């Protein structure tokens, strides 16, 4: 289907959140799955739009955002900004856990309040990272490849030489797609179930 890539604008925030809700579980939707539909995008979309909108791009079909790519040029800097500027916003809406996470939603909340877990030593040589999501009708048509190319150029211009992304084990099609684009898996000892893949930015 016809769509074009453009830089993110502030008015795209609800559209990006909608796409995240429709795709936020390894490409499948999470609408109605948690106590609020904002839970997943508040972890996987909002902080990037708020903290580093200069590296955010949307796929626009002329009516709305139907896909996006977001991320950071420096994961350590992003984690510091998340803790200083994004977590206070989250604490106004969500209650930190008082004990170990037990449910799926509690595991999401646990991840939300502990961004420092993203600072893994094996990923240090790959400072940039990204998240990409497209609605089903806009997959397998070159849009994902073009979004990734656009993002890598953006973070390269900001000084990042290499980028990583994470793929859940169940998302076999996504891993196959990334490997076709030249992303290579790396061993990460303390990773949650899934795979990390890396790619130079230029």
Regions found by a protein language model. Give the residues of each.
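A short beta-loop-alpha structural element at the N-terminal edge
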Residues: 4-18
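Active-site rim helix/loop that mediates acceptor-substrate recognition in acyltransferases
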Residues: 34-56, 62
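Conserved GNAT acetyl-CoA-binding A-motif
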Residues: 126-128, 155-168
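Conserved beta-strand in the GNAT
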Residues: 58, 64-73
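Conserved acyl-donor/pantetheine-binding loop and adjacent beta-alpha core of acyl/acetyltransferases
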Residues: 76-131
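Conserved GNAT-fold acetyl-CoA-binding loop/helix
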Residues: 25-44, 81-95
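Conserved active-site alpha-helix within GNAT-family acetyltransferase domains
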Residues: 125, 130, 141, 145-146, ...
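Conserved catalytic-core motifs of GNAT/GCN5-like acyltransferases
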Residues: 76, 166, 179-198
